[in-house]
């Protein structure tokens, strides 16, 4: 198990060939310059496998770093956490959509954050709790390092899992606070 000593090392990963036509590869990005995060899930035969959960760094040379991060897998769906219109991170969304437009068959979807609540701190706390519960479910809790800043990887993981569960019409109580199916917005 690799810890997050380097900004682009994986928190959790599994080996997989770049092309596996009988599965769906879902990637979710929690957008940000200093603390972006990516989760990659494989959905195959009604089961979910965690391929990768990574903390990334796009603080400098961001075009090259994002392109490298996008080129590691062949995704069928890419989920991007929606950003406010005037956010400096909107440029990342447009870059990712443009990069994948001609180079990939992936469907790119901007989605609302999974958790809603009274305060930013409360939302982040609930996101980390749901993430750790899922890590227990997948038997990967021991792979998660003790860190104070897990909210970014938690947010990316929860984006991906909510998408999978919605496709299967499955309710998961921590995600129920968002309006069902209304979280997907086109940019």
Swiss-Prot record:
One of its GO terms (molecular function) is nuclease activity. Its EC number is 3.1.-.-. Keywords: DNA damage, DNA recombination, DNA repair, Hydrolase, Magnesium, Nuclease, Phosphoprotein. Binds 1 Mg(2+) ion per subunit. Its cofactor is Mg(2+). Pfam families: Pox_A22 (PF04848). Signal peptide: none annotated. One of its GO terms (biological process) is DNA repair. Disulfide bonds: none annotated. The keyword Magnesium applies. It comes from the Viruses. It is an enzyme of class 3 (hydrolase). Belongs to the RuvC family. Poxviruses-type subfamily. Plays a role in DNA replication by cleaving viral DNA concatamers to yield unit-length viral genomes. The concatamer junctions contain inverted repeat sequences that can be extruded as cruciforms, yielding Holliday junctions that A22 protein cleaves. This is Resolvase OPG149.
């Amino acid at each position: 198990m690799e810890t997050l000593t380097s900004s682009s090392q994986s928190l959790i990963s599994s080996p997989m060939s770049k092309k596996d036509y009988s599965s769906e590869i879902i990637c979710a990005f929690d957008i940000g310059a200093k603390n972006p995060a990516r989760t990659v899930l494989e959905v195959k035969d009604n089961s979910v496998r965690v391929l990768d959960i990574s903390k990334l760094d796009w603080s400098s040379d961001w075009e090259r770093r994002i392109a490298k991060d996008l080129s590691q897998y062949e995704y069928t769906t890419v989920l991007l956490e929606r950003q406010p219109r005037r956010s400096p991170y909107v440029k990342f969304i447009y870059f990712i959509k443009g990069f994948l437009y001609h180079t990939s068959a992936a469907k790119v979807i901007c989605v609302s954050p999974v958790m809603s609540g009274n305060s930013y701190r409360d939302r982040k706390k609930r996101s980390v709790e749901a993430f750790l519960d899922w890590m227990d479910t997948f038997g990967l809790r021991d792979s998660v390092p003790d860190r104070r800043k897990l909210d970014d990887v938690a947010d990316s993981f929860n984006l991906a899992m909510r998408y999978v569960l919605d496709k299967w019409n499955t309710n998961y109580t921590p995600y129920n606070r968002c309006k069902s199916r209304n979280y997907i917005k086109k940019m």
